């Protein structure tokens, strides 16, 4: 099972449904859920930090990003929270994204396995990661956001600024499936 921490974003149920469509059980929990409570459940294989409207109401997610022994994927606000937890800078975007954008993949690495070097994705955010710490590596960018995706260099921690769970994102299902593979899920392909 994948546990999804609900940061109040409009797509949290869409994340759960997208995982269900690929055969991965998922449960939505409050963003205040204790990491120890999550990790003591042997059925949970990974954590997704959802999007949401307010970075100040999701500080528990930073603790999870820093200390989880399970793989973590941050989506939108979740992506920003991971970067912030490790010392990155999150600021207002120069160009707020509420549209489809072209994502350019720099490194195929894990979540972008078999994803084309360029694809269209749905973005919906006012803030973005402006600077990442040395422990994170940029995996993808767009013309208006330099950090559309990253990976921790030593841990199974990932972030995507765009929304892989919505149908407007090309290869979004594959990106989610790749994260689930990192978590240990197997698929008949």
From Swiss-Prot:
The active site is at residues 76, 163, 165. Gene3D superfamilies: 3.40.50.880. GO terms for cellular component: cytosol. Its EC number is 6.3.5.2. InterPro entries: Class_I_gatase-like, GATASE, GMP_synth_GATase, GMP_synthase_A. Keywords: ATP-binding, Glutamine amidotransferase, GMP biosynthesis, Ligase, Nucleotide-binding, Purine biosynthesis. Residues 1-189 form the Glutamine amidotransferase type-1 domain. GO terms for molecular function: ATP binding; GMP synthase activity. Pathway: Purine metabolism; GMP biosynthesis; GMP from XMP (L-Gln route): step 1/1. It is an enzyme of class 6 (ligase). It catalyses: XMP + L-glutamine + ATP + H2O = GMP + L-glutamate + AMP + diphosphate + 2 H(+). PROSITE patterns: GATASE_TYPE_1 (PS51273). CDD domains: GATase1_GMP_Synthase. Pfam families: GATase (PF00117). Catalyzes the synthesis of GMP from XMP. HAMAP family: GMP_synthase_A (MF_01510). This is GMP synthase [glutamine-hydrolyzing] subunit A. The gene is guaAA.
């Amino acid at each position: 099972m994948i546990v999804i921490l609900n940061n109040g974003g409009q797509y949290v149920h869409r994340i759960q449904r997208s995982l269900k469509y690929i055969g991965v059980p998922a449960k939505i929990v409050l963003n205040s859920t204790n990491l120890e409570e999550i990790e003591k459940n042997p059925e949970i294989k990974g954590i997704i930090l959802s999007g949401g409207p307010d970075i100040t109401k999701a500080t528990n997610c930073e603790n999870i990003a820093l200390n989880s022994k399970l793989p973590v994927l941050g989506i939108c606000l979740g992506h920003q929270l991971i970067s912030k937890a490790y010392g990155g800078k999150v600021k207002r975007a120069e160009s707020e994204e509420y549209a489809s954008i072209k994502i350019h993949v720099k490194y195929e690495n894990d979540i972008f396995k078999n994803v084309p070097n360029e694809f269209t994705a749905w973005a919906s955010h006012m803030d973005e990661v402006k600077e990442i710490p040395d422990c994170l590596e940029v995996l993808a960018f767009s013309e208006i956001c330099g950090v559309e995706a990253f990976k921790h260099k030593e841990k199974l921690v990932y972030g995507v600024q765009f929304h892989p769970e919505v149908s407007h994102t090309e290869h979004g299902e594959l990106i989610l499936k790749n994260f689930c593979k990192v978590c240990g899920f197997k698929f008949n392909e």
